[in-house]
Design a protein with these regions (language model features):
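Single conserved hydrophobic/aromatic residue that forms the stacking wall/gate
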Residues: 1-9
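Alpha-helix capping and helix-loop boundary segments enriched in small/acidic/polar residues
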Residues: 5, 28, 75-78, 124, ...
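Glycine- and aromatic-enriched mobile tails/lids
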Residues: 5, 43, 49-70, 110, ...
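Rossmann-like flavin
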Residues: 20-60
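Conserved redox-cofactor binding core of oxidoreductases
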Residues: 45-127, 132, 139, 147, ...
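A glycine-rich dinucleotide-binding beta-alpha-beta segment and adjacent secondary-structure elements
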Residues: 105-121, 269-323
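Glycine-rich loop(s) and the adjacent beta-strand/alpha-helix scaffold that form part
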Residues: 135-192, 196, 334-350
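An anion/pyrophosphate-binding glycine-rich loop and adjacent beta-alpha core
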Residues: 166, 172-283, 350-357
Length: 398
């Protein structure tokens, strides 16, 4: 490719995504991610997202783990919150109806096998209702609050794999559901923020991973699976740092950021991280912080085609972390926000266009009974109700 050309830049992004995912990615989905990505960034910028820019108004780009060049755009270290602020304002300004405190607990199909809506549960009143729809988009996020292998998580309380349960029970296929991303730098001290994300941007601006012997034992911007396994290895082999309460982790040498970038770099580039630690009297400009891997991202999910549609259930679309195949078995930094915007925006457009041609038949929940019959035939018993709308942290039910 012509170095510096638009296609060369996208080709390199494609190769980075494929390599980072151990070439288990679905090529068609990766192509869509990198081809539609620049237009989506421009769309967000036009909507008012306050991306980091230099004095001339050009967007600042940074490296992430496993990337061959700087390409990641950010809004300080709270890009997700800034994008959500902008999109929320857009929803309000356009008077788009939103049903709050209400979760989908079952998809509805018609006799032709098409998705036909969902059963909704009002989590305040306990009342059920039916939403009839010609197209449905599942965008329910991840599963970190399942706490696989007993790990802490950076995820919100609703990250309990609800969308995967809904889709699977209705007949949608799952892809790479065994693959979960452990972010290498989750907070392990203080305990009040156990599992909270220490963003990769901390390492992209200069912080090093250091073991108890003072050794920078690994490149800080390896892919996340490599860095996470490296942290665990150091702790398992006796080179971890003791943490109050009996846990172990490694140091993230944050003072190195200001040595490399100059005084004020931390407050300028990663202000949210600085505030989070200062809330507990820890000045990351002066002392390193202690970290350990945290459950962060669901690499697998529901199977979709290049247009975002389920390949098994007509008129069902999936976007964001609930979809599988885009990131293979390991996601690169920055690609989750890009993914949810590229495929979320696409899903909205495709759903709106498709519903004009859909004719629904009689609605039913036959697939739920069929699924229950399969469980009984297999002798599977469970004491949990799914989807699990909130994690089970109580010792016993009231």
């Amino acid at each position: 490719c012509l170095v510096g050309s638009e296609m060369c830049i996208r080709d390199r992004h494609y190769l980075d995504v494929m390599g980072g995912g151990h070439f288990a990615n679905v090529p068609e989905l990766v192509e869509k991610l990198v081809m539609d990505g620049p237009d989506c960034i421009k769309w967000l910028n036009d909507l008012g997202v306050l991306f980091d820019k230099d004095k001339d108004g050009n967007m600042i780009t940074t490296h992430g783990g496993g990337t061959s060049r700087k390409r990641m755009h950010a809004a300080k270290d709270y890009s997700g919150a800034e994008i959500m602020r902008t999109l929320r304002d857009e929803v309000i300004n356009r008077a788009i109806p939103v049903v709050e405190f209400t979760s989908a607990v079952e998809l509805i199909k018609d006799e032709k096998g098409q998705v036909a809506g969902a059963v909704l549960l009002n989590m305040e009143t306990g009342d059920y209702s039916v939403a009839r729809a010609k197209t449905v988009v599942i965008a329910t996020g991840g599963a970190g609050r399942m706490h696989y292998q007993g790990f802490p998580t950076s995820n919100h309380y609703g990250a309990t794999a609800d969308g995967l349960v809904l889709g699977y029970r209705a007949g949608a296929a799952l892809l790479y559901q065994d693959s979960i991303q452990y972010h290498p730098t989750g907070a392990i001290y203080p305990s009040q923020i156990l599992g909270a994300l220490v963003t990769e941007k901390v390492r992209s601006v200069g912080a090093q991973l250091v073991n108890a012997n003072g050794e920078a034992y690994i490149h800080p911007l390896e892919t996340r699976d490599v860095n996470a396994s490296g942290v665990i290895r150091e702790c398992e082999e006796g080179r971890g740092v003791d943490v109050p309460g009996g846990a172990k982790g490694v140091w993230l040498d944050t003072p190195m950021i200001e040595i490399l970038g100059g005084e004020g770099t931390i407050e300028k580039r990663i202000p949210a991280m600085f505030r989070m630690y200062m809330n507990y009297g820890i000045d990351m400009r002066k002392v390193p912080i202690e970290i350990y891997p945290t459950l962060h991202y669901q690499n697998g999910g529901l199977n979709i085609d290049g247009d975002g549609f389920s390949e098994e259930i007509p008129n069902l679309l999936v976007a964001g972390e609930a979809a599988g195949g885009i990131h293979g078995r390991n996601r690169l930094m920055g690609n989750s926000l890009l993914d949810v915007i590229v495929f979320g925006r696409n899903a909205g457009k495709k759903a709106a266009a498709k519903c004009k041609d859909v004719e629904l038949g009689e609605m039913n929940l036959d697939h739920v009974k069929a699924y229950d019959d399969e469980l009984k035939a297999a002798g599977v018993e469970t004491d949990h109700v799914s989807p699990l709308l909130l994690p089970h942290y109580a010792r016993h039910e009231r």
